[in-house]
UniProtKB/Swiss-Prot annotation:
This protein's domain notes: Consists of three domains; the N-terminal catalytic domain, the editing domain and the C-terminal C-Ala domain. The editing domain removes incorrectly charged amino acids, while the C-Ala domain, along with tRNA(Ala), serves as a bridge to cooperatively bring together the editing and aminoacylation centers thus stimulating deacylation of misacylated tRNAs.
Swiss-Prot/TrEMBL GO biological process terms: alanyl-tRNA aminoacylation; negative regulation of DNA-templated transcription
Compartments it resides in: Cytoplasm
Keyword Aminoacyl-tRNA synthetase: yes
Classification lineage: Bacteria, Pseudomonadati, Pseudomonadota, Gammaproteobacteria, Lysobacterales
Chain's role: Catalyzes the attachment of alanine to tRNA(Ala) in a two-step reaction: alanine is first activated by ATP to form Ala-AMP and then transferred to the acceptor end of tRNA(Ala). Also edits incorrectly charged Ser-tRNA(Ala) and Gly-tRNA(Ala) via its editing domain.
UniProt-recorded name of the protein: Alanine--tRNA ligase
UniProt key word Ribosomal protein: no
Domain of life: Bacteria
Cofactor binding: number and manner: Binds 1 zinc ion per subunit.
Enzyme class: ligase
InterPro entries attached to this UniProt entry: aa-tRNA-synth_II/BPL/LPL, Ala-tRNA-lgiase_IIc, Ala-tRNA-ligase_IIc_anticod-bd, Ala-tRNA-synth_IIc_core, Ala-tRNA-synth_IIc_N, Ala-tRNA_ligase, Ala_tRNA_ligase_euk/bac, DHHA1_dom
Length: 882
């Protein structure tokens, strides 16, 4: 093998892509860690994710051969290596997968030949160090390895169904229970007999001697529901090779953490934490986690308490805890980003492009967790010390999670280091109890759930309201009174009316339900709200003002058009706002919730810090630019995959049907949405942001108004400005300058007032020093000073200490029925009397509390007769101690 210096991690990436480019492959960029074509998948966890639809026949690419280096993440859901990271030689949260692909073009012969050529001729791996496996019945692959490549039979291992079912094997790959599948052949590197472990298929195959470096999957069958395998008309090749594992071999090191990329990060982490031992497992954890966290943020994920954001938060906090273990008490994690950019920025230009966003997001999370990490660790140590049978109670693990922000796997991590376990069932029970409490608190009016037997008899309500506000022929399918199904209702009854069709929009997607009226055959129902039940039935909520109503009656419906009209302006504006936020703040911004009402809109979104006034102004301006552009608001109904290919944004965790509704406003915004909207963006008229603030960690909220509401808001602001100008005795144009002048005048007056207070205080303390009582050579003074606040009392205390020398002093300042207290001990009295104890004693007598250092303490309580009594008793309390 050539000297390892040639094969840096960067060179290996380049070699791989150049090699397959020379074999006619199109070089495809890495897909993001957040899958764009599958909202149900947490993260991209393998190279084939971005080609999934090609293999399934749902997508056709312009090429039949491809090669890529795919960034992958396994730290959540089914694929979760988090608890192993840092403690083993080869587990990572983030890793890179080298892959080459054939979509119905070349097959086994070329795939095997090229893999061998790259390994042995380009990277010069000794052929005698390589061992291969094939599926038990894949005689074709076996023969190719033996006859074409020349691998000795003793270094070709057949692997059968070793997972308890037909075709369930390490060497048989399948995408799902049905669909594309096929045998695979794996290439292993033999580290030599000085390393423990046996070849694949042997009892000790889990040792470290034989390391898998490349897996070549031959998709040649379509698995049927009955388990039979039907040959595919165009077999495909899917290969994957872990970059970190390969780099370890080519650089002559045994663990992935010893390769150049990781060593650069470990050395920087060592410098930041002051840890000299480069083998320290905590340094490995930190080096691994900075890659995962940085690229997640690059791909639009921010720390939060749900979904992908919570996985990111868990990884960050695990890294921070390992820094804490190394003695770090200041932010350090984000300082690794420049080193990461040096190592990986050339391969992934999106990383240096987003370096500011990555750094700020990590800094914000570090600062947030630092507030609770120390306290949480103290709680853990206390709990661990009391743990019986080596188990941390679930309720305590939940307290660490709920109060101190410790993810469960972080608590498990810490427990494992102390040979403890965590009561997972108890944790889950505590979590469920909190959810039940939240659900109970969140139910308005007790909530209404349709009985299953009623649901079984109903057909989904057909919504007619996209293009009309009035409709006839609304057949009553069900009536609910007091939450229970009834056959009829009378005038005065509060009811929910479910119909077969309706122009009324039922609350969903943040948009409030319509109001209006249902009429027919002497019946009149004022609809106060429209709700969706069981996800498919529109319930008109209101009170019968006239007539009697029964199941089967046919009604007409009229939606309140003015209210709906105002609502749709706000709904369409939220889409433009979302797009503007992503343009100004970054692609990490994602909707976290919304309220679309006729009088306002509220939009919650992921972002890690407050938005500046300048940024808000730019966001508002960009939305209004789109309003003035008067683009058509186009609605397209299409399949889910077609919508994603169309560029529509899907939210992770949302449930979408096979067919979806896409709203496209010009080239600016394309989102999935089932709500009602304007015809053109110009209909919105005007967009004004009224407030911005934080909702929870990593989630911000903007409130805004549109149309007439925006005009009313501007009118009100102008009226307030005019009133302010009148009060200041000038015009609106003079307001800022006059306020600035007032502020300067106020500061001047405050300085003058402080000077007067200082003179008064100096005079008061001069008078007080003569009132001190001498006890055992120490001056004892307790006095009340009218109008003195805590600062003035401390200033007086400093002067009295200088005047009295050895002294015990208590001062009380009374203002507005409250008493401020300061106690001080000076000179020889300091070893005998403690100011904190003295002040606590006095404060307790006047319904207050306080404390502090032995030489100075402060507190407060109620002003009144008890204060005079407490001050009079100071000499008596002090005397025995002197």
């Amino acid at each position: 093998m050539n000297a390892s210096a040639k094969f840096t991690t960067s060179q290996i990436r380049s070699d791989f892509l150049e090699f397959f480019k020379g074999k006619g492959h199109t070089i495809v960029p890495s897909a993001p860690l957040v899958p764009g074509n599958d909202p149900t998948l947490l993260f991209t966890n393998s190279g084939m994710v971005q080609f999934k639809d090609v293999f399934l026949g749902a997508e056709k690419r312009s090429y039949v051969r491809a090669a890529d280096v795919q960034r992958c993440l396994r730290a959540g859901g089914k694929h979760n290596d988090l608890d192993q990271v840092g403690y083993t030689a080869r587990h990572h949260t983030f890793f890179e997968m080298l892959g080459n692909w054939s979509f119905g073009d070349y097959f086994k012969k070329d795939a095997i030949a090229w893999a061998w050529e790259l390994l042995t001729q380009v990277w010069k791996l000794p052929a005698e160090r390589l061992l291969v496996t094939v599926y038990q019945t894949d005689d074709e692959a076996y023969a190719l390895w033996r006859d074409m490549v020349g691998v000795p039979e003793e270094r070709i291992v057949r692997i059968g169904d070793n997972k308890g079912a037909p075709f369930a094997s390490d060497n048989f790959w399948q995408m799902a229970d049905t669909g594309p599948c096929g045998p695979c052949t794996e290439i292993f590197y033999d580290h030599g007999d000085h390393i423990a472990g046996g070849p694949p298929g042997s009892p000790d195959e889990d040792g470290d001697r034989f390391i898998e470096i490349w897996n070549l999957v031959f998709m040649q069958f379509d698995r049927q529901p009955d388990g039979t395998l039907v040959p595919l008309p165009a077999p495909c090749v899917d290969t994957g090779m872990g970059l970190e594992r390969l780099a370890a071999i080519l650089q002559h090191v045994h663990t992935n953490y010893e390769i150049d990329l990781f060593q650069a990060l470990i050395r920087k982490a060592s410098e930041l934490t002051g840890t000299a031992d480069l083998e320290n497992k905590s340094l490995r954890v930190i080096a691994d986690h900075i890659r995962a966290c940085s690229f997640l943020i690059v791909d639009g994920v921010l720390p939060s308490n749900e979904g992908r954001g919570y996985v990111l938060r868990r990884i960050i906090r695990r890294a921070l805890r390992h820094g804490w273990m190394l003695g770090v008490r200041q932010p350090f994690f984000s300082k690794l980003v420049p080193t990461l950019v040096e190592q990986m920025g050339e391969a992934y230009p999106e990383l240096p492009a987003a370096v500011d966003t990555v750094t700020r997001a990590l800094q914000a999370e570090e600062e947030r967790f630092a507030e609770t990490l120390d306290a949480g660790m103290k709680i853990f140590e206390d709990v661990a010390g009391k743990a019986s049978n080596g188990v941390i109670p679930g309720v305590d693990a939940f307290r660490l999670y709920d109060t101190y922000g410790f993810p469960l796997d972080l608590t498990q991590d810490i427990a494992r280091e102390r040979d403890l376990t965590v009561d997972i069932a108890g944790f889950d029970a505590a979590m469920e109890q909190q959810r039940e409490t939240a659900r109970a608190a969140g139910k308005f009016g007790g909530g209404v759930t349709l009985p299953a037997e009623l649901v079984a008899t109903l057909s989904p309500t057909l919504f007619l309201g996209y293009d009309r506000l009035q409709a006839d022929g609304l057949t009553v399918l069900a009536l609910l009174k007091d939450g229970r199904p009834v056959q009829s209702a009378d005038a005065g009854d509060a009811v929910i009316v479910i119909t077969n069709q309706t122009p009324f929009y039922a609350e969903s997607g943040g948009q409030v339900g319509d109001t209006g009226v249902l009429t027919g055959n002497g019946v009149r129902l004022a609809v106060d709200d429209t709700q969706k039940f069981a996800g498919q039935f529109h319930g008109h909520v209101g009170t019968l003002s006239e007539g009697g109503l029964k199941v089967g009656d046919v009604l007409s419906g009229q939606v309140d058009g003015e209210r709906r009209g105002a609502t749709i302006l706000n709904h369409s504006a939220t889409h433009l706002l979302h797009a503007a936020l992503r343009e100004v703040l970054g692609s990490h911004v994602q909707q976290k919730g919304s309220l679309v009402a006729p009088d306002r809109l509220r939009f919650d979104f992921s972002h890690f810090q407050p938005i500046s006034a300048e940024e808000l102004a730019v966001i508002e301006r960009k939305v209004n630019q789109q309003v003035r552009a008067n683009n058509a608001a186009e609605v397209h109904n299409m399949g889910m995959q077609e919508a994603l290919d169309f560029g529509a944004m899907a939210l992770f965790g949302e449930k979408y049907g096979e067919h979806v509704r896409v709203l496209k406003m010009g080239d600016y915004s394309t989102e999935l949405c089932g709500g009602t909207h304007v015809n053109r963006t110009g209909d919105i008229g005007l967009f004004k942001i009224t407030s911005e603030g934080g909702v929870s960690a990593g989630v911000r909220r903007i409130e805004a108004v549109t149309g007439q509401g925006a005009l009313d808001y501007v009118d009100a602001e102008e009226a307030r400005l005019a009133e302010a100008a009148e009060l200041l005795g000038g015009s609106a144009a003079d307001v800022v300058e006059k306020i600035r002048a007032l502020g300067q005048r106020q500061k001047q007056l405050e300085r003058e007032l402080e000077a007067v207070k200082a003179k008064v205080a100096a005079g008061a303390t001069a008078d007080l020093s003569g009132q001190a009582v001498e006890v055992a050579g120490v001056k004892v003074l307790a006095a009340r000073l009218e109008g003195f606040d805590a600062k003035a009392l401390r200033d007086a205390m400093d002067r009295l200490k200088q005047q009295l020398g050895d002294a015990v002093i208590v001062l009380a300042g009374a203002q507005d029925g409250k008493a401020a207290l300061v106690a001080g001990v000076n000179g020889s009295a300091m070893g005998k009397v403690k100011a904190g104890e003295l002040l606590s004693h006095i404060a307790s007598q006047i319904g207050g509390k306080g404390g502090g250092r032995p030489d100075l303490a402060q507190g407060g309580g109620e002003d009144g007769p008890a204060l005079a009594t407490a001050l009079a008793a100071v000499v008596e309390w002090v005397s025995p101690r002197l």
